[in-house]
From Swiss-Prot:
Enzyme Commission (EC) number: 2.5.1.19
Identification of the protein by name: 3-phosphoshikimate 1-carboxyvinyltransferase
S-S bonds: none
Residues annotated as catalytic: 315 (proton acceptor)
Compartments where found: Cytoplasm
Assembly and binders: Monomer.
Gene name as annotated: aroA
GO terms for MF: 3-phosphoshikimate 1-carboxyvinyltransferase activity
InterPro entries: Enolpyruvate_Tfrase_dom, Enolpyruvate_Tfrase_sf, EPSP_synthase, EPSP_synthase_CS, RNA3'P_cycl/enolpyr_Trfase_a/b
GO BP, sorted A to Z: amino acid biosynthetic process; aromatic amino acid family biosynthetic process; chorismate biosynthetic process
Length: 429
C-alpha cells in the first residue's frame, strides 16, 4: 500500500493544465461507440475509471485506436454492439457501471457488470428500479441494490420519472436507455444535475429536449460520429484552486478548464468564502464552456452551504472541507447526503481525517459543521480508497504545521494520473 508525505509549501505558483474532464471522457466513448461513423476525441482522460469504460466497449466489438493524443472510435450504430464474452469490469467507476446499465438494458444480448470491492458496495437500485419500470430485466445482489449486475437485454418503453436525488448518473442511465426505447423518456430532478449528457446527446444529433423542468429523449434516432475536444476537469482543477487560495503568497493560472454552469458550484462556494478566482478567455469548445482560471491566495471565511449549489459541487466537497478547515469561523454543510454513498462515505472520511490533524468537526446526517483552525496540524491520515479524499488531504498538507502523510494513495490514478507531477511543479519549497 503506497503512502505519500507532503510538506508545507511557501506558495503555489505558475501555470498548469489539468487532465481532461472525467464525465465528458466517459460519455464521449459511450456515444461515439453507438454512433454511426468515426468519432475523434482529443483531451481524453486516461485515468483508470475512463479506461474501464473504454475497455468495456472494446469488449463489445468497438474498434478504438489511441495514438496517445487522439482516440478514434469506429462507431457501430445503435444496434451494432456485440455480446461480451466475459464480465465487464468497471473497476472503481460508478459512472461506468450506472451508465452502462442504462445502455445495456435495451441491447439484444446478455451482459454482466462488476467492479472492485468499493464499487460492489455502492447503491445501484437507483438506476435498476427506473430501468425496470421501462421493462428492463436486471438482477443484482440484495434485490438489485449491489453489483454484480446481470442484464438480459429487452425492448424498452419510455417512462416519465422523477428522481428523488439530483444525480447525473441516474439521469444519464435513463437517457441512454431512452435512445432505444419506444416513445419518450422524461426525467425530472429536485435540482439540476450536471448536463454533460444533454449537451453531448445534442452534439451527436439525438432527439432531445431539456430545460429547467427536466430532459426528454425520444428513441429510435441514429447518432452521427463527431469530433470532440475534452476540456480540463474542474473537479481536478478544484484541488489546485484550493491550494492556491489557502497557501499564502500564491498565484496560479489553470488553463483550459471546463466551466459548465452545472459544475461551477466549487467556484461559487470558494468565491462566497472570500476567495480570489477570476475567469479569463471564456469560450466554447465542443458545446462546453471553457475558461482559464486565475487564483490568488485569500483569507477565507466560513459560510453555510446548502440548496442548489450542492449538486453543482458534489464531487468537490472533500477539498471544500479543507478550505473550510483553514477559514475563519464555522462552515456548515447541509443537504449533501449523497456524499455518504460515493466511493466511500465522504462525510465520515473527511470528518475522521480533519479531526486527526486538529480540526473540530461535527457530523450531521446530511453534512457537517467545520470550525476553522488557525493551522492544520501534522499527522497521518487515510484515503479510505477514495481518490478525492486522498488528494484533498494532500492539499491540506501544503498549509499544515508539519508533514501530512496520506496512506493508500494509488487510488488517485482513477481520476488524476498527473496529480503528483503537477503538485511538485507548483508547490514552492
Amino acid at each position: 500500500m503506497q503512502s505519500y508525505t507532503v510538506r508545507p509549501a511557501k506558495g503555489i505558483r505558475g501555470e498548469i493544465t489539468v487532465p481532461g474532464d472525467k464525465s465528458i471522457s466517459h460519455r464521449s466513448i459511450m456515444l461515439g461507440s453507438i454512433a454511426r461513423g468515426e468519432t475523434t476525441v482529443r483531451g481524453f482522460l486516461r485515468g483508470e475509471d475512463n479506461i474501464a469504460t473504454l475497455n468495456a466497449f472494446r469488449a463489445m466489438g468497438v474498434v478504438i485506436d489511441d495514438d496517445g493524443e487522439t482516440l478514434r472510435i469506429a462507431g457501430k450504430g445503435l444496434r451494432g454492439l456485440a455480446e461480451p464474452t466475459d464480465v465487464l469490469d468497471c473497476g472503481n467507476s460508478g459512472t461506468s457501471m450506472r451508465l452502462l446499465t442504462g445502455l445495456l438494458a435495451p441491447q439484444r444480448f446478455y451482459s454482466v457488470l462488476s467492479g472492485d470491492q468499493y464499487l460492489r458496495r455502492r447503491p445501484m437500485r437507483r438506476v435498476v428500479e427506473p430501468l425496470s419500470r421501462m421493462g428492463a430485466c436486471i438482477h443484482g445482489r440484495e434485490g438489485g441494490e449491489k453489483a454484480p449486475l446481470a442484464i438480459v437485454g429487452r425492448d424498452l418503453k419510455g417512462i416519465s420519472y422523477t428522481s428523488s436525488v439530483a444525480s447525473a448518473q441516474v439521469k444519464s442511465a435513463l437517457m441512454l436507455a431512452g435512445l432505444y426505447a419506444e416513445g419518450e423518456t422524461r426525467v425530472t430532478e429536485p435540482h439540476l444535475s450536471r448536463d454533460h449528457s444533454e449537451r453531448m446527446f445534442r452534439h451527436f444529433g439525438a432527439d432531445i429536449e431539456n430545460g429547467p423542468a427536466g430532459v426528454v429523449v425520444r428513441g429510435g434516432r441514429e447518432l452521427e460520429g463527431r469530433d470532440i475536444i475534452v476540456p480540463g476537469d474542474i473537479s481536478s482543477a478544484a484541488f489546485f484552486m484550493v491550494a492556491a487560495l489557502i497557501v499564502p503568497g500564491s498565484e496560479l493560472l489553470i488553463r483550459g478548464v471546463g466551466v459548465n454552469p452545472t459544475r461551477t458550484g466549487i467556484i461559487d462556494i470558494l468565491t462566497a468564502m472570500g476567495g480570489s478566482l477570476e475567469l479569463l478567455d471564456q469560450r466554447e469548445v465542443s458545446g462546453e464552456p471553457v475558461a482559464d482560471i486565475l487564483v490568488r491566495s485569500s483569507r477565507l471565511k466560513g459560510i453555510e452551504i446548502a440548496g442548489e449549489v450542492v449538486p453543482r459541487a458534489i464531487d468537490e466537497f472533500p477539498v471544500i472541507c479543507v478550505a473550510a478547515a483553514v477559514a475563519e469561523g464555522r462552515t456548515v454543510v447541509r443537504e449533501a447526503r449523497e456524499l455518504r454513498v460515493k466511493e466511500t462515505d465522504r462525510i465520515a472520511a473527511m470528518a475522521t481525517n480533519l479531526r486527526a490533524v486538529g480540526v473540530t468537526v461535527t457530523e450531521s446526517e446530511d453534512g457537517m459543521d467545520i470550525e476553522g483552525a488557525e493551522q492544520i496540524a501534522a499527522g497521518t491520515v487515510e484515503s479510505f480508497g477514495d481518490h478525492r479524499i486522498a488528494m484533498s488531504m494532500l492539499i491540506a498538507g501544503l498549509t499544515a504545521g508539519g508533514d501530512i502523510t496520506v496512506t493508500d494513495t494509488e487510488c488517485i490514478g482513477t481520476s488524476f494520473p498527473t496529480f503528483f507531477p503537477l503538485l511538485e511543479k507548483v508547490a514552492a519549497r
